[in-house]
Structure formats: C-alpha cells, structure tokens
C-alpha cells in the first residue's frame, strides 16, 4: 500500500481507427512481448473478417460479444474456521469487462483455425451469437456461483 493514498488508475487512449478505449484494451490483451503493432494488425484483420462474413459493423458485433461474455457473479475463496468456502460475489463493472476481454482472447488462442485473426474473428462472432468457449466459461462461472449460493452470507 502506498503511503500517499490510492494510486490513480491509468487511462488508455482510444484506438486511432475505431476511436474506442475498449478496442485499445482488447489490443493490449492480444499483445505478446510488447508487440503492439502486430496485435493491432491481428485485431483489425479480425474486424475485417467479421465485417465480410456478417455484413454488420464489427464494433456492434464486438460489443454484443463482450456483453454476452461478461460475468455478473463469480466465486471467491473465503477461509472460515479451517474450511475454505467458495463464496459467490458480484463482479465489479471494471473487472467484468477485464474478464470478458481476457476470456475472449484466451479462448480464441485455444481454437483450431490457422491464423489468430480467424480464431479471434470466429470467437467474437460465436460470442455475439451466445455460443463459443468464452460464453461457456461465463455460464460455468455463473453455475459455480449458483451452486454455492448457500455460502452467500459469508460475503465480505
């Protein structure tokens, strides 16, 4: 903990093409070893693929996908009298978007298509249609929270 109070959150700059901070955050999630140019190329190509296949604005598809992937509840481990309980808690809005972006990118990486552009485009389109691995992760997270509802009174 710093002595001078809470450290202010750094704000990201909106990306040059779509003028969106969400897109910048997605680019940062895709980026490996500081190669931002490569990450941008991957995302913009993926967006072109989405535009080509759906005929819709890729930003709308992406926002819908993110909305379908963002979790509302999650479980957190809480130690009570020598036992660990999985306590369901509500996810804060900032963490909600962070988890949504992280899951989209991680599950896109695990897909079988040849290039990352195709994987990302397909994962985003699947998520927009409420299918795909990232949406399944959200459903599993909600199921876990629902199953452990009995421990909700241990919230902190």
UniProtKB/Swiss-Prot annotation:
Pfam family, one: Ribosomal_S7
Gene3D superfamilies: Ribosomal protein S7 domain
Gene Ontology terms, MF aspect: rRNA binding; structural constituent of ribosome; tRNA binding
Cysteines engaged in disulfide bonds, as pairs: none
GO process terms (BP): translation
GO CC annotation terms, alphabetical: small ribosomal subunit
Classification via InterPro entries: Ribosomal_uS7 (IPR000235), Ribosomal_uS7_bac/org-type (IPR005717), Ribosomal_uS7_CS (IPR020606), Ribosomal_uS7_dom (IPR023798), Ribosomal_uS7_dom_sf (IPR036823)
Keyword line: Ribonucleoprotein, Ribosomal protein, RNA-binding, rRNA-binding, tRNA-binding
Coiled coil: none
Keyword match Transmembrane: no
HAMAP family, alphabetized: Ribosomal_uS7_B
Family recorded in the similarity comment: Belongs to the universal ribosomal protein uS7 family.
Purpose: One of the primary rRNA binding proteins, it binds directly to 16S rRNA where it nucleates assembly of the head domain of the 30S subunit. Is located at the subunit interface close to the decoding center, probably blocks exit of the E-site tRNA.
Subunit organization: Part of the 30S ribosomal subunit. Contacts proteins S9 and S11.
Name of the protein in question: Small ribosomal subunit protein uS7
């Amino acid at each position: 903990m710093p002595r001078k109070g809470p450290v202010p959150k750094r704000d990201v700059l909106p990306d040059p093409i779509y003028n969106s901070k969400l897109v910048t955050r997605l680019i940062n999630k895709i980026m490996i070893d500081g190669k931002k140019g490569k990450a941008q190329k991957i995302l913009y190509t993926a967006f072109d693929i989405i535009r080509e296949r759906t005929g819709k604005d890729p930003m709308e598809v992406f926002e819908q996908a993110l909305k379908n992937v963002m979790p509302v509840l999650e479980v957190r481990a809480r130690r009570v009298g020598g036992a660990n309980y999985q306590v369901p808690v509500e996810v804060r809005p900032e963490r909600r978007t962070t988890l949504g972006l992280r899951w989209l990118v991680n599950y896109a990486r695990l897909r079988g298509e040849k290039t990352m552009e195709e994987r990302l485009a397909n994962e985003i389109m699947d998520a927009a249609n409420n299918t795909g691995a990232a949406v399944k992760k959200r459903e599993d997270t909600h199921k876990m929270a629902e199953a452990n509802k009995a421990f909700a009174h241990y919230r902190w």
